[in-house]
Amino acid sequence: MSFKNLQQLLKEAAAQERCGRVICYSSGNLQNPTSRSYHELMQEAQRASWALRTATCARHGSAVLLHFDSHWDSILWFWATLLAGCVPVMSTALPNNTSLRTAHLEHLSRTLNGPLCLTRARMAPEFSEQTCIEPIAVETFDMQTSSKEDHVDSAPDDTAVMMLTSGSTGRPKAVCLTHGQILSSIVNKLSVVPLRGPFMNWIRLDHVAALTEIHLPAILSNKDQVHVQSADLLANPVEFIRLASEHRVAKTFAPNFFLATLRDALCATQHDSPKWDLSGLYIFSGGEGNVTRTCDEISKLLGRYGAPPNVIVPGFGMTETCAGAINNTSCPWYDIERTSDFASLGTCMSCIRMRITDDSGGNTCVSPGETGNLEVTGSAVFKEYFNNPSATADAFTSDGWFKTGDRGLIDTNGYLHLAGRLKETMIINGVKYSPHEIESVLDESNIPGLTPSYNCCFCSFPPGAETEVICLVYLPTYPEEDIRARIQTTDAISKCIVMLTGSRPVIIPLDKGLLQKSALGKLSRSSIKASYEKGEYKAYQDTNSHLVKMYRQAMRTPPKDELERSLLAIFVDSLELSEEEFDVQTPVFDLGITSIDLIRLKKSIEEQRDIDQEIPMTTLMANTTVRELSAALHDLQAPGTYKPVITLQNEGSKTPLWLIHPGVGEVLVFLNLAKYIKDRPVYALRARGFGAHETPFASIEETVRTYYAAIKAKQPRGPYAVAGYSYGTMLAFEVSKQLEQGGDTVGFVGSFNLPPHIKTRMRQLDFTECLLHLAYFLALMSEQRAGELAAAFAGVQPSQERVLDEVMQNADPVRLAELQLSRQYLLQWANLAFALQSMAVDYDPSGSVARMDVFYCVPLAVAAASKQRWREEHLSQWRDFTRSEPRFHDVGGAHYTMLAPEHVFGFQKTLRGALEARGI
């Protein structure tokens, strides 16, 4: 080994004359990847490292949480963090459940000692409703400059990366993997099978296999590496083989459930006779048990395209062992000869040793063929969980072997076979879940029909299945004959578990006599699971299934419009359903679909309905019927007439927050903010004049009447919370006065950086200024360029067409395309903005509201010389128009950027604190 750390590994690879490449396919794109050499990766990582060090308080050796969903971002910032002398922590996907997500982030903050967190701006809202981890959007970093300062070096025993153990519903531990452990592991991985071509990965880099099975070994061997988004392959498994053939892949990874899906897809395409070349391909498989039959069938199918007989390599590995450490290179014939239902996991790499011990606690090994506790040791095995000495101590035997938590046996040939788990964890499609956490969430959800503390969650491997299924038995509160309550309870439980795991459970209501608690008030999970697998609950399961099916058929509901008809057809076709068993009111998870089916369904809807924007997976999970999904999608497709109210966020039970548009009339600026607010609905008021046949408001009075009526129609009773951004503050003030005059309580009035007196500024804004401000506001050009054009037009009165010509010529064409802005629409928008400004040229504030919160930032240069003078000389005048002392809140950013991605996290914390302080 010629290097002592990972930084040297990359530096060595980047220096090669013909170095390998990182090839990345973006989401939804399987045709046109990006490609960067290891030399280019090193250069970009050095720039990113410099940006990280200069823009943050990153300290040498401190943890940096990396939360990305694209392969390139994860790779780039992994190396940037290492080069900066920090320790990358690969963040897993956050739980969908709000309380679990908050608890997860709070746990990470404590465990990692308040880490920096890097992410993309579009992902920052995932960190809402908590304040312990503040995400930093990497778009805010200056990536164009860098220092000649070289990377920070590391010793072999230094921690290179922290990987989080599966914490989808439990509390993850941070596994410290050192440079030496990783290097030992990846060197040995290259000798398991002959690897002559590129590597391919399709799982996130927060999974240790993506890092230590694919990314780092590819760099070590100076081979290309191909990265594909998992959703694209799950939706179309045949693409996995096409890409492997196209790139002449030598090594990739796939768990058993995907191998089964791939087998079925290949069987369906055999008549097409594709000309694939899979010679030299090896698919390593782990994470869950490999069914011998599946390995045999897929091996034969792949063999038709030149794959070696042992193309499938089952194995055992954990985060704590740098992923795969034990491999079976004799699959499937080794297990076929022994008539084993599940494939053996093989023998150890040279850097790992394994043993099977008895339950005596004396580190006594059992004889070959006897079942016991699997323990491992070696240079690729971790030594500690970060900041968790008790878990570290529990993880090792008295003589220093790592306790894997698995039961197994080693046969007379030295091959490992697993025989279950010590801990009550469930593995569904290769992901671990805690049954305790699922039960807790169900209890906390207060589901009608479900008796609290009388539900038991476990997993089972049905005969002939490819992966385990989640089972949930519960004690119902409804009478046995109340079929409607039975259905509603089943639907609610199913929806909750699917949101947590992405997998549809088997749900069985049982009599209380079958759910006996111990003296300590506990249900015996092992006994209940054993009874289920013996068939003791089959009569209850069959009765429940029959009643549910009969109810669905009797209550079958036809589609009410074209969208529902279209969606129903897509559901039936995509999921291969019978129209007799499925209608617009049938929860899709009642049909036993998997997360893979859900991804495929999502893609089909987006393509066949020609929906421009991606449908969030949570939308499908939360809207489980065609009717619910139709309602959720309707606003995306229906143009409609002028409707001032835009629903930005519809969750939560607290007082709704009303946000009124700035001077450009649009509410897009509030989208980032609304994503962080989950405890109350967020509505925005949009100006009239954007529609093809709409005319702008003629006066402030008309605007206020319209907005007042819209608010009352949506929220008939107070208390109210109303805020406006810039120009919108004036409208928020006037609307709030109207509400108070009608006898309503307005508990919160917010001014986002606007003083009460605005007419002088309004008189300065002619059409040219409005158009240029709009162009800058929409990021069509820089503030500097907008100022230069304003100076060029100063003292003249150019026509609208001439100003528009200049703006279109100077506008960023990519941004124009993103916004789908035509010349005519931009002109219409500018006229709307000008109309709004014009109706305030004689505005003088009068009257008062009970209270006001003023959020202030760096003002426009024409408005004040400093933030302090802006507050003291201008914003302070709100005291004349409130019946109590206004509260002032200093926020980050400048007038046009206070709600931008780089500042919105801090802003929303301040805003939520202000709302809470007002008791609203």
Curated annotation (Swiss-Prot):
Domain of life according to the entry: Eukaryota
Molecular function via GO: transferase activity; very long-chain fatty acid-CoA ligase activity
Species for this entry: Aspergillus terreus (strain NIH 2624 / FGSC A1156)
Membrane-traversing stretches: none
Region (Thioesterase (TE) domain): 656-905
Comment, domains: AtrA has an A-T-TE domain architecture. The adenylation (A) domain recognizes and activates the aryl acid substrates, and loads them onto the thiolation (T) domain. The thioesterase (TE) domain shares the missing condensation (C) domain function, and is responsible for condensation and final product release.
Assigned keywords, A-Z: Phosphopantetheine, Phosphoprotein, Transferase
GO biological process, one term: fatty acid biosynthetic process
Family: Belongs to the NRP synthetase family.
Modified residues (O-(pantetheine 4'-phosphoryl)serine): S595
Keyword Transferase: yes
Position of the signal peptide: none
Name the record gives this protein: Nonribosomal peptide synthetase atrA
Lineage, broadest ranks: Eukaryota, Fungi, Dikarya, Ascomycota, Pezizomycotina
Carrier domain mapped to chain residues: 558-637
Uppermost EC category: transferase
